[in-house]
Regions:
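Hydrophobic beta-strand positions
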Residues: 32, 54, 99, 121, ...
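A short helix->beta-strand "capping" segment at the edge of beta-propeller domains
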Residues: 11-28
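Serine-hydrolase catalytic core recognition
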Residues: 320-499
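Beta-propeller blade-edge and WD-like acidic-aromatic loop motif
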Residues: 11-16, 39, 43-64, 78-109, ...
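Conserved beta-propeller blade repeats
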Residues: 25-43, 69-88, 114-134, 138, ...
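Bacterial N-terminal signal peptides
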Residues: 1-7
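Residues at the C-termini of beta-strands that transition into short coil/loop
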Residues: 56, 69, 101, 114, ...
Length: 499
């Protein structure tokens, strides 16, 4: 009774304070285990901005590794040095490769060449790194010796060497012109994979490092290709793709003859997969009504093994095995809590949380959870502010399906008294407007459109305002999804009203 009276006596916190708490909430994602299996590096906003940190795999307090004003885009350990890391930092809006260690030494640039730098992969002994430098239309595939820091460009052998060009092969500059991801390196170190965009469609390219020529592995019609992984013997390349089907699944490409076969495509989209270092196990994350479900399969039999499930949520990025193949590491998003690094030890019970990102003065009960609804033929998610009988609505549309997980932008609008309806797919805007018109417990007047991906707005007159992502050039209000100005968002949603 005393606790109840004290609760009732506490005044409701004002909106500016709640938005401040939201802005202070952090996240952690993109785990990368160390070669010796003792630590895991990851990306986080615990220290302000997108920085790199590391933590002992058995638990502890995270150590901040970087302090880059532009933030960090990627991180991985150097295979030959357990405490040395390669990071991709954003400097002057360019991706730059830096080498650093966990002992606090300043990060050192690997290559002074201008342009964006894409890491591809280390040789097995960790003594050489392959990467691409792209500056405008110029693309250069390079390697660097980690001990001497000597940079070498991958170039074709001289004509006198007698090398024969493969029929249909491409120059590296042509093959990498639409590069958006590089790697992995083949186990024998003779070739490297690249993901590119050609003629408006994604494709997988395999580059021969000795001949400095490349070939298309996927000369198909429009499709997505993601997360390429070699088998331990280098004969097979696994890739996440929707080629020839409506949802993403795992295919295997035989490197020698370029044939492709389906390995696992259950019907529901796959968000990520990982092949163990011994090549005998395939871990997959399957989208089930917006939430991810893990499965573990033997290769090549595809016999399903039991796998403990983390709390209901969705992946933040991919999944990765540690080197012994004893545990899976992944970033995990929850509906009412921060995104953090989790580990799943095979045969050791439930997954455990490695990091606990701060959310000061923000209890889990204070974060509204979404409800699954139907907007026409589409599945939709509705976040409602508590204790408001008929709130105004903001409609969220995006290129990819919205997940029912904690989002600062949605929580800020809920705190400000707006409901958020997330609808995806063709006709999403019309379906959302029809849903609002039919809903008796929502105010259909003056809806706000949240359009972070800059999708075409079918009828601007139907919306009281439009919130776009940065540099989308469609007018309205711009909001950075990685570092949103929540107060500006709420002011715009309230049509300029004070907080």
């Amino acid at each position: 009774m005393l606790a109840l009276l004290l609760t009732l006596a506490v005044p409701a916190e004002d909106l500016p304070a709640r938005l401040r708490h939201l802005e202070s909430a952090a996240a952690a994602w993109s785990p990368a285990p160390s070669p010796d299996g003792t630590r895991v590096a990851f990306l986080t906003t615990m220290f302000g901005g997108r920085q790199a940190a590391s933590i002992a795999l058995e638990g502890g307090y995270p150590t901040q590794l970087t302090d880059e004003p532009g933030g960090i885009a990627e991180i991985r350990y150097v295979p030959s040095e357990p405490r040395q890391l390669l990071v991709v930092a954003l400097r002057d809006d360019r991706r730059r490769l830096l080498l650093m260690d966990e002992d606090g030494a300043p990060p050192a640039p690997l290559d002074a060449a201008a342009g964006d730098q894409f890491p591809g992969g280390f040789t097995r002994d960790g003594k050489k790194l392959f990467y691409v430098v792209r500056d405008g239309s110029k693309v250069s595939l390079r390697s660097i010796a980690m001990d001497t820091r000597k940079v070498s460009e991958v170039v074709p052998p001289p004509p006198a060497a007698g090398a024969q060009r493969a029929v249909g092969s491409l120059s590296l500059e042509d093959a990498f012109s639409g590069l958006f991801a590089l790697g992995p390196l083949s186990p024998d170190g003779r070739s490297i994979v690249a993901l590119v965009v050609r003629s408006g469609s994604e494709a997988v390219v395999l580059a021969d490092l000795q001949a400095a020529r490349a070939e298309l592995l996927t000369p198909d019609k429009a499709a997505r290709f993601r997360q390429p992984r070699f088998s331990p013997d280098g004969r097979t390349l696994y890739v996440l793709t929707d080629a020839g089907r409506s949802a993403l699944g795992v295919d295997a490409i035989t490197v020698q003859d370029r044939t492709r076969r389906t390995v696992y495509a259950p019907g529901n989209p796959l968000d990520a997969f990982a092949v163990s270092d011994d090549g005998h196990r395939l871990a997959v994350a399957v989208d089930s009504t917006g939430l991810d479900v893990f499965s573990l399969l033997d290769l090549p039999s595809l016999r399903v093994q039991p796998l403990a499930a983390p709390p209901a949520g969705a992946l933040a990025g991919g999944i990765i095995w540690d080197r012994p193949g004893e545990r899976l590491l992944f970033g995990w998003r929850l509906a009412d809590d921060t995104t953090d690094i989790w580990q799943l030890r095979l045969g050791r019970g439930s997954p455990t949380r490695l990091t606990r990102s701060p959310r000061p003065a923000l209890s889990r009960n204070a974060i509204p959870r979404p409800t699954l609804v139907r907007a026409g033929e589409a599945q939709a998610w509705l976040w409602r502010p508590p204790d408001l009988p008929k709130p105004r609505v903001a409609v969220l549309i995006s290129e990819t399906p919205t997940r029912p997980v904690f989002d600062k932008r949605i929580a800020a609008l809920n705190f400000a008294g707006l409901a958020v309806l997330a609808v995806n797919g063709p006709g999403a805007q019309r379906a959302a407007l029809a849903f609002l018109k039919a809903a008796e417990d929502l105010d259909p007047r003056d809806p706000l459109l949240l359009n972070p991906d800059g999708l075409p707005v079918e009828d601007p007159s139907k919306w009281s305002g439009v919130v776009n992502g940065p540099r989308k050039g469609q007018g309205g209000h711009e909001l950075d999804p990685d570092d949103p100005d929540l107060r500006a968002l709420v002011r715009y949603a309230r049509r300029g009203g004070a907080l």
